[in-house]
């Protein structure tokens, strides 16, 4: 039976490239694994992942903090939409693991995985975790630093 892993994160290369490295390492270790990514259309992942040969499902998501009032409000509106999109994607893919890399793109997917009781790994690349990984680390099964 083929294992399926969904990796979420992006927006910047700091979240995305460690995820690509993880995906390639998993594929080297286990040839019978299918890796998919979830991100946004506006993030770097929309350009990089197709070139790297990975499937990308785009969702609506945006950062929640550090914005002007209207932009912040729109970000909160996108959160339930992105979560619903993520839930549909996860129900369709039925992964054995969801990996959150941090950044606003990982929030809806990891929350959906938690609601669907899919195992969650948070992958933190920095010495100080970002806000998304701090929040999501509380519901994750494992946190890798």
Residue ranges and their predicted role:
Residues 2-9, 28-78:
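Conserved nucleotide-sugar phosphate-binding/catalytic loop shared by glycosyltransferases and other
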Residues 43-47, 97-116:
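An aromatic- and histidine-rich active-site surface loop
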Residues 33, 44, 55, 114-145:
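Active-site-proximal region of nucleotide-activated glycan assembly enzymes
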Residues 25-27, 92, 108-119, 138-139:
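Alpha-helix C-terminal capping segments
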């Amino acid at each position: 039976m083929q294992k399926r892993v969904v990796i979420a994160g992006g927006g910047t290369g700091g979240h995305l490239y460690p995820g690509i490295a993880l995906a390639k390492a998993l594929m080297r270790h286990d040839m019978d694994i299918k890796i998919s990514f979830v991100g946004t259309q506006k993030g770097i992942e929309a350009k990089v992942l197709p070139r790297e040969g990975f499937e990308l499902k785009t969702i609506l998501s945006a950062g929640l903090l550090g914005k002007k009032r209207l932009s912040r409000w729109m970000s909160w509106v996108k959160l339930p939409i992105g979560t619903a999109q993520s839930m549909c994607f996860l129900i369709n893919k039925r992964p054995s693991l969801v990996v959150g890399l941090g950044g606003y793109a990982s929030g809806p997917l990891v929350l959906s995985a938690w609601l669907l009781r899919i195992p969650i790994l948070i992958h933190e690349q920095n010495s100080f975790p970002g806000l998304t990984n701090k929040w999501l680390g509380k519901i994750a099964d494992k946190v890798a630093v």
